[in-house]
Amino acid sequence: EVRADGAATLILLRKRYEPAAGVPLPAPVVGNEADVPADMWMDIEGARLQTLIPDDVAYDIAMNVFTFAPGYSLPIVETHVMEHGLYFLQGKGLYYLDEEWMEVEATDFIWMGPFVPQSFYATGTTPSKYLYYKNVNREIPL
């Protein structure tokens, strides 16, 4: 049962679980994002990361929340071998994707293919926050 004191948004991600040989099934994860610590990311005071799913080989997906203070950014342009996506929760920013900067804001969704260069810069006057997911702990079919 899920209850909310006010308006709520449900984000549903459907993904078939990929078992790993000799690894038991993961335990269900239920919680509230507000109860997950926001740890400083890469020693950058204005960048915080909340890890929503345990970093354990039993889980085949990572789901995290990044929060950036205005003016802070990912310090690198990165690529990943796996596809992944993000849902923008609050604030505004510029997202760099495949050689193009685009403005993003709350309720925007971005799907990123494998090996696509990407980065993020928080704009506006309030913190920017996004939920992202990616496949982890399994071989990526190439």
Enumerate the language-model features and the residues they cover.
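Well-ordered beta-strand positions in beta-sheet-rich domains
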Residues: 65, 101-103, 117
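A short glycine-rich, His/Asp/Glu-containing loop-to-beta-strand
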Residues: 38-77, 83, 133-136
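A short, N-terminal "cap"/entry segment at the start of jelly-roll beta-barrel domains
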Residues: 7-61
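Tight coil/turn sites that cap or link beta-strands
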Residues: 5, 70-71, 107, 113-115
